[in-house]
Amino acid sequence: MITISDAAQAHFVNLLADQPEGTHIRVFVISPGTATAECGVSYCPPDAVEADDMELEYNGFNAMVDEKSAPFLEDATIDFVTDQLGSQLTLKAPNAKMRKVASDASLNERIEYVIQSEINPQLASHGGNIMLLEVTEDGVAILQFGGGCNGCSMVDVTLKDGIEKQLLEMFPGELTGVKDATEHQAGDHSYQ
């Protein structure tokens, strides 16, 4: 479920050595399955362990995961990276904002998953996002741009060279194209 690198495991063992006996770590997701989902790691004293917690065993410590967070932490990784600027703990949870969809899910569900987990996080750096409106019978995904993407002068490049290329590679034989249905209006909200 959660892959913790050897360096991160050693880091947790060192941190827990200064805590009361029986203290674990807790890995959790706040607002799982939403665009505002955030992951975190905290200490979990013995009296904070819940009956429905999932207990994961690692080298020298255990990690607790609450029942609600568990499906959103599937394929999560925790690493401890050291470079010239110092060291930091990184937690990557690709399914925190949206649960991974089954391989037999509908085309719309699979496209929506890619949009929420891969494309929108990239567009968010410009304050933008996209939404899937529909997939036509001839396999064209109809999208609507929002936020900073609405009215952006680079929207056509983003659509054709970025989003369409990515989606066609991921869904060969199922998608034939991508079209923008947005009525673009440049304004203060538009990315420049």
Swiss-Prot record:
Q: How does it assemble?
A: Homodimer.
Please name the source species.
Shewanella woodyi (strain ATCC 51908 / MS32)
Name of protein: Fe/S biogenesis protein NfuA
Q: Choose any GO biological process term that the UniProt entry carries and state it.
A: iron-sulfur cluster assembly
Q: What does this protein do?
A: Involved in iron-sulfur cluster biogenesis. Binds a 4Fe-4S cluster, can transfer this cluster to apoproteins, and thereby intervenes in the maturation of Fe/S proteins. Could also act as a scaffold/chaperone for damaged Fe/S proteins.
**Which ranges does the record mark as transmembrane?**
none
Requisite cofactors: [4Fe-4S] cluster
Q: Which UniProt keywords apply?
A: 4Fe-4S, Iron, Iron-sulfur, Metal-binding
